[in-house]
Amino acid sequence: DINDELGYLTSHDTVVLAPHLLPKFDMTAPKVESLQKLNTLLSSVYTFKAANLALNPIPDSFKTLMIAGPKQDFSDWELLQIDQFLMKGKSLAIFLDSFREIRQDNNAYSSFDQPVFLPLNTGLEKLLDHYGVRVKKSYIMDKSCYVNRGQDGSEMPIYFVPILKEKQINQDFSFTKNISEIVMVKNSPLEIDQEKIGRHKLKATQMLASSDKSWEMAGKINLLPYMIQPPTDEKEFAGRPLAYLVEGEFPSYFTDKPLPEKPQKQEEEKPADETGPTGQVQKPAPAAPDTHIKEEKGIITRGKPGKIFIIGTSDILRDNLLDEEGVSPNAMFLLNILDYLSGKEDIANMRSKNQKFNPIGETKPFTRNLIKTFNIVGLPVLFILLGVFIWARRKAKKKMIQQMFKK
């Protein structure tokens, strides 16, 4: 295969990349949310390979491992596999959800039922915290957001769908300079521990942030749009980090800890799911012996230069935010980030030059209300005045003709 391998974690109840086809007449099968558009876009550049930590170690052939919305706990042994993968100078693309969304049973009275949001802890959080990054247990609400407009002219802001403008997107990278708008959904803010970042000599770069008119929803989460009200205290509004890129020689989380034992069930190699040569997840090649391990403990305690991209949502990967051609800002950002993590920054730069989406400038509420008022009231008044003017002209002309015949 001429394409580089891109690892995708298929264990731990991550978002399904490309589901197996369901039986043709099985109408009772539950609907499986998947990332089919992302799978199609990336399959032209990469060969997706499954990484199942319960079956096999992460192959050395991967340059980048994607972890999208895990919901099951990671054992210490599995965290060790991820930690040591990073120590080898590899990259992690982590799309981490802070809450598990539990939908209510459908019934005749549930049209207004709100899903229950429970805090989600998988163990991956402590690994990230060791590297100096934390994902907060809250959602970002933003006045700069998607607005649902009704046929009657009414507007309903969807605060948990922020629309990031050019000022909130890091423009220091050549592959992000032409991206002027990104849509987010149910994003948790991030925190950087500057003391750890400095002590480990890492570089943390903020890639995305909310607007200055954003706030956090924590505790009891309720995402019914008409129930969400902005805070009255202006001090609660502030821009907050939504995505970070951390680079450098990461220290191992297990340096001063007892090494976890390999589970017995991993002693016997089991085949991973293979979905065929259609750009979907395939079985990885067996891992080669690790020649980098030189420490007495049998692990790498200080890694080669690696990268972590971390964002507090997996919804940005879903089909409703991407296009099939890969020219939308959201698709462009994701493709470019994964290329950068995989050492293909030149491809990301070339792709970014083809960015054609240039949104019109945002109008202020006063301007929008003025235009609405003019359309509703101004235009009818103009028509009335025009009618009066035509009537007056006709009356004057009629009077002039009468005066001519009197002579």
Task: Label every model-predicted segment.
Residues 1-40, 52, 344-407:
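Hydrophobic targeting/anchoring helices
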Residues 1-4, 10-11, 15-346:
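Acidic, S/T/G-rich, low-cysteine, solvent-exposed domains in lumenal/extracellular/periplasmic regions
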